[in-house]
């Protein structure tokens, strides 16, 4: 399983990229709005930081509007992946974009059959949202397992991105289930490096070393 960073903050992205563990980033309108900057100018900065897929989402809800935005985004840089919402209009757009060679990430997926439809429409990636399902008392990891099983049974090439990651347990379980990617917020990524026994071990090694002096 590969890691993506779920962020539109250039400083977070620089730090995460320097760690050497992420292969790309995902953004959404909410993350971009937090930055308070022009969307296209922000993307132009991000493609200079990360040499990997960068998911950028359309705002339009109709097929033609999505196609117009998608083509504009894709023309900015070869690494741009266009995020499309999981709707009927969205899947119509995905089919056209697939034929045009534009990569897509179908987002806001909350059922295995939605993921299957997206794959059949030609999506490059699908993004099931784990945390948001957990929030309403459902099991996001079970959804992820169902999607990975269905895709495996039918030999689908669409890649699965575990999204709406809330904690390190989500990351571990996503890897065990077989997700192709996990897109993690910066705070969760930082948590993955830490373990109390690692920190205690470092302190002990240093203390023992000091005794030699």
From Swiss-Prot:
The keyword Lyase does not apply. One of its GO terms (molecular function) is aldehyde-lyase activity. Transmembrane segments: none annotated. CDD domains: Transaldolase_FSA. It catalyses: D-sedoheptulose 7-phosphate + D-glyceraldehyde 3-phosphate = D-erythrose 4-phosphate + beta-D-fructose 6-phosphate. GO terms for biological process: carbohydrate metabolic process; pentose-phosphate shunt. It is an enzyme of class 2 (transferase). Its EC number is 2.2.1.2. Pfam families: TAL_FSA. Coiled coil: none annotated. It is found in: Cytoplasm. Keywords: Cytoplasm, Pentose shunt, Schiff base, Transferase. Pathway: Carbohydrate degradation; pentose phosphate pathway; D-glyceraldehyde 3-phosphate and beta-D-fructose 6-phosphate from D-ribose 5-phosphate and D-xylulose 5-phosphate (non-oxidative stage): step 2/3. GO terms for cellular component: cytoplasm. Transaldolase is important for the balance of metabolites in the pentose-phosphate pathway. Belongs to the transaldolase family. Type 3B subfamily. This is Probable transaldolase. It comes from Desulfitobacterium hafniense (strain Y51). The gene is tal.
